[in-house]
Amino acid sequence: MAEQLALVIGCIIGGLLLLIGISCCLWKRLCTTFTYEELPETADTATSSSFSKKEERPCRYAGIPSVRLPSVPFVVPPSHQGRDWVRLHGGDWAVAPQDPCPVPEHITCTSSPAAGQTSLPLCVMGSINPELYKSSEDVSEAGFPDGCLGRLWFSVEYQQESERLLVDLIKAQHLQVPAETCSTLVKLHLLPDKRRFLQSKAKRKTCNPQFDESFIFQVSSKSVAQRVLKFSVYHINKQRKHQLLGQVLFPLKNETLAGDRHRVIWRDLEAENLEPLSEFGDLQFCLSYNDYLSRLTVVVLRAKGLQLQEDRGVVSVFVKVSLMNHNKFVKCKRTSAVLGSVNPVYNETFSFKADANELDTASLSLVVLQITEGDKSYPLGRVVVGPYMYTRGKELEHWNEMLRKPKELVKRWHALCRPMEP
């Protein structure tokens, strides 16, 4: 009985092994009937047309007569290894000739200590991967306006937990240097602190310097929204003296700090205003009128030299913009308040509905006010722009230039006049 049982088990095992062997043979024969072809790096017309001229291959299956099937071209995508890379005009790299899209080169981030400034920390942040940085405007490297002093690219991020402001200084272009050779550096201030600053490394023999440096400012979360980041671009002359080429003022507002650090920001350089301050300070703003939309736009940029009333308590300043018609109030809007600065920066835009036939009797009143104790406001200065009926001098010129240049932002400084007592 035991011998019969062993014989049955042996037969079963032998049968299973035989079936496995037959299955393996059939699988191998089936796999050999298909061929895979990899296209060369550069596919030409002759190669692509050769598929139609391939001879038919026999396909045999077990127990089935030979059947001749046309070959099916299977394409393996070519790899990018071995491609030629060419350098573009803007300093980027691209694959030639198959891939015309530029691929940015990887940049190294370095540390640049400020001379004699130990209280503001500066450290190496690692390599900057340009693919992570998204430019907010597509025309950032084109369309330099007439009289442009240069353009600066940077990014900012505020880390709430560690109370650190991270600034990436990326590059500058189209710098206007009063010399044959250009050697530039950038100083970074966190206003209103003008004494301490951080400084980049000097870039020599180029008007389009690539900095790729990271800086850290330690600043409280309570005051960071009131701060202004200032970039000052200098040219180093033969006497090793620093000559200012232009500056960028970037307010650190909440909506700015909440953005993505990898979003690249660019700003055009502005010349330093060397005109003497007025008695009550000065206000800079832009005017624009869109006749198609019947929209009057005011951009409040900054003020300087304000005469703050320290004895009235809290020192924070805002600007109230009012649209008047026949000296009657129509509508008003106000900027956010900036704390503790006689040179506040706003960069806020307001729009008013105004028909073209109303511009001869309309005017704009901009009043700078200081917030005092009890949420009361005290006027520091005032300026009115409008037609000949209400204004003269620079204020009238600004209004007329706005009308001559529709849909364009016309920017000017204006001296504040004596405020009206509340």
Swiss-Prot record:
What InterPro entries is this protein classified in?
A: C2_dom (IPR000008), C2_domain_sf (IPR035892), Synaptotagmin-15/17_C2A (IPR047897)
Tell me where it resides: Membrane
The C2 domain covers: 148-267, 279-400
- What are the GO cellular component annotations? exocytic vesicle; membrane; plasma membrane
This protein's record includes keyword Repeat: yes
Q: Which GO terms describe its molecular function?
A: calcium ion sensor activity; calcium-dependent phospholipid binding; SNARE binding
As for membrane topology, the entry says: Single-pass type III membrane protein
Give the Cytoplasmic membrane side ranges.
Answer: 28-422
Family statement drawn from the similarity comment of this UniProt entry: Belongs to the synaptotagmin family.
- Tell me the protein's name: Synaptotagmin-15
